[in-house]
Structures are given as C-alpha cells and as structure tokens.
Design a protein with these regions (language model features):
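Negatively charged
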Residues: 2-317
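C-terminal outer-membrane/trafficking sorting elements
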Residues: 323-397
C-alpha cells in the first residue's frame, strides 16, 4: 500500500472495513491527504514493517489508533509530520522493533500524549523527532536511548517541552546539533550526560532562552563544531572553562547574545588558551566583555590565529559577581618581589595564574604574597576569605 493515496488531497472515504492483514508496507499511504479523517482503528496492521511518512501532511487526521499492533514496525520516521490535528492516545503501542523515529512528530502541533512507556531501545535515530511539536510536554526520562546515535534537532521548536532528561544514556550520540534550538521553555539538568562521542554541537541551545544549567562536567573533547551553540540563549551563564576544546574547529557565533558574564568569559579564555587548540578558530561572543582574560585572549589570537568577536575590554564597571567581592587593597603593583594585601580579613586563600591560565601559586596568606620566583609578566590573583572572592591583576617586574 506504499503511496496508495499519496497527494489525493480531497480523499476522505471510509475504508475502515478493509482487510489489511497481509500488508507489510504502508509508507507514504496518506501523504498529502489534506482532508482525510476516517476511522482506521479496526485495521489489523500486525504484519506491517514500514509506516514511514504514513500520515505526513495529513493535516486533518485525528482518529484513534490505540488498537493497532505495531510490534513488527521497523520504520516510523516522518510518520506524523505536520499531522497538525493528531492528538490520540498511542501510549500502548509496542514500538520495540522500531529502529528509526526521526521526525516522527515533526510539526504535530497538537500532539501531547503520554508515550513514556515506549520501548525505544533499538532506535538509532531520534533526529528532529519533536521538531515544532509545540504542545508536547511529556515525561520521557526513562526511555532507553542507549543505541541512539543521531539526536540533531530532537526538541527544536518544542516550545512547551520542559521535562527531565538527565537519565538518558546518550553515550553513543554523535550529533546534537540543533537539539534544543528554540526550545524556549526547556531548563532541565543535563550534567549526567556522557557526550564523549559527540562531534557536532552546533546550534544545540540556539535561542533556548530559558536554559541555564551546569554542564561544566561535559567531556567535549571530540567535538569539532560549536557554531552558534548558545546563540541568543539569553539566560545562559555558566562556567564552561573546564571544557577540553582542543578538537573544536569552529566556535563562530557560539556565545553571541548569551548572558555570559565577564568573569565566566575571562576564565574560559584563560583556561582554553592553555590548551593545544586548533588553529584559526572563529570564536563569537558578541555582546560579552572581557577583563582579566585579556592576555589569554591575545595569546589565542597571536599564537593560534584565532579570530575573536566580542564586546571588547571592560574592567570599569562592577559585574553582579563583583558585588560579593572582597574590599582589599594590593600594593605595590607592579612589584618585583612581594605584594602586600590590606583589608578586613584574618586569612586569605590565594591562587595565582600566569597569562596562559597555569596555576603558579596556591597558598594561604595573612598579609603578603612572595612573587620573587616568578618570571616577569602579568599574573592573575584569585583571593578568597571563604565567603567572598575577588580577582585582581598584578605585574611582576
């Protein structure tokens, strides 16, 4: 029955009594059947293996399918693409033999049914599955996605979706590009995800305007593409300086118009400049200023040929973080041997970094730091009394 009623835009006959028990493929069966909306729930589809594109662009279709035995269906990709009226309970479907669900509910704008019990353990493709499925907001945290390799665009435009996903085993996924693009409600922890096999994170959180979760522990060492990763993710402000970005070839527009603070941008520049990064990488941070990361930024440009677009140097205004900084005075600066610190404290923890982000001093002090053994140059001091933290720059001459 492949393509049987394809493009029959006015077809709307009652075919509910058909004996389809020997049919093995229903691919494209009702594609572009604009007005079709007839009962099909009595069909015996137990021998069907391919339902891909079955109701694609069947804009009016919204009939129960809960009686269907889909246990032999292997291909479900594009099944309900732009079936914009469809919102039926298919929670009991046995999809355990399906391997492909890419774009299954793309544009199914009213679909919002509980499919939490689905066994998707054989599926390798969930790409664009809920693209523009703007009503979908169901808990699918217990899905076994351990064999999925492709999750590009999975929740792109799923504007209502904000459910936990931290239990997902994504260790085989290679492509997360556009995964949460324009998923404007999504703000759930993803810190447990093993992304060590991912190579593409381009546009992953593009316009994900609510997302602001700690993903500092992610192993991104195999990622080569981070273009537009947080573009216009205008609440995202997390420390990702610990990321190993040595494989990344393109960060163009990566942080543009995000909510990245000066301090988070600084520490990212400092730590990344210490890595064996790729040459001539474009890093976009439009709207974001730097201060203490100035030397590290210049090192990335001069040594590695990076092209960095940001809002420039700004050490003049206090950031939100600065409101909790220590009230101290450091002198002399520059200094050749010892730097003294005055302020209302009893003891300070001090960590000193060189311009490449390498830690050169880590100790507790009472009133001074011995820098006599350091090479000449600019150093960054992080000082903490246990409650407040401040960052200062000194020059060793």
């Amino acid at each position: 029955m492949n393509n049987l009623f394809a493009t029959q835009r006015v077809f709307n006959a009652d075919i509910s009594s058909w004996d389809v028990s020997n049919v093995t493929t229903m691919s494209n069966m009702f594609i572009y059947c604009d007005v079709f909306n007839q009962p099909l729930n009595d069909w015996d589809v137990s021998n069907v293996t391919d339902m891909s594109f079955m109701f694609t662009y069947a804009y009016a279709f919204n009939q129960p399918l809960d009686n269907w035995d889909v246990s032999n269906v292997v291909y479900m990709q594009w099944m309900f693409v732009d079936a914009s009226a469809f919102n039926q309970d298919i929670s009991m479907w046995d999809v355990s033999n399906s391997i492909a669900m890419g774009r299954m509910f793309q544009g199914a704008r009213t679909f919002n049914q509980d499919i939490s019990s689905w066994n998707v353990s054989k599926v390798f493709d969930l790409g664009y599955m809920f693209l523009n499925a703007s009503s979908f907001n169901q808990d699918i945290n217990e899905w076994d996605v351990s064999n999925v390799e492709f999750m590009a665009g999975t929740f792109w435009g799923a504007t209502a979706f904000n459910q936990p996903l931290n239990n997902w085993d994504v260790s085989k996924v290679k492509n997360f590009s556009y995964a949460f693009k324009s998923a404007t409600a999504f703000n759930q922890p993803l810190n447990s995800w093993d992304v060590s096999n991912v190579t593409n994170m381009s546009s992953m959180f593009f316009y994900a305007s609510s997302f602001n979760q700690d993903i500092s522990s992610w192993d991104v060492s195999t990622v080569t593409q981070m273009v537009r990763m947080f573009y216009n993710a205008n609440t995202f402000n997390q420390d990702i300086s610990s990321w190993n970005v040595s494989s990344v070839e393109d960060m163009n527009l990566m942080l543009d118009n995000s909510d990245f603070s000066i301090s988070n941008y600084d520490v990212a520049l400092i730590n990344w400049s210490q890595q064996a990064v790729q040459p001539e990488v474009k890093l976009g941070a439009l709207g974001i200023n730097y201060c203490d990361g100035a030397d590290a930024r210049q090192n990335l440009i001069d040594t590695h040929g990076w092209v960095i677009t940001d809002a420039g140097l700004d050490c003049s205004t206090a950031s939100v973080e600065d409101q909790n900084q220590l009230n101290i005075t450091i002198y002399p600066n520059p200094s050749s041997d010892r730097v003294y610190i005055e302020g209302n404290y009893s003891q300070l923890k001090v960590v000193v970094y060189d311009i490449l982000g390498k830690q050169v001093i880590n100790e507790s002090i009472t009133n001074s730091i011995d820098i006599s053994q350091l090479e000449k140059g600019v150093y960054i001091l992080q000082l903490s009394d246990g409650a407040k933290l401040t960052t200062e720059r000194i020059l060793k001459n």
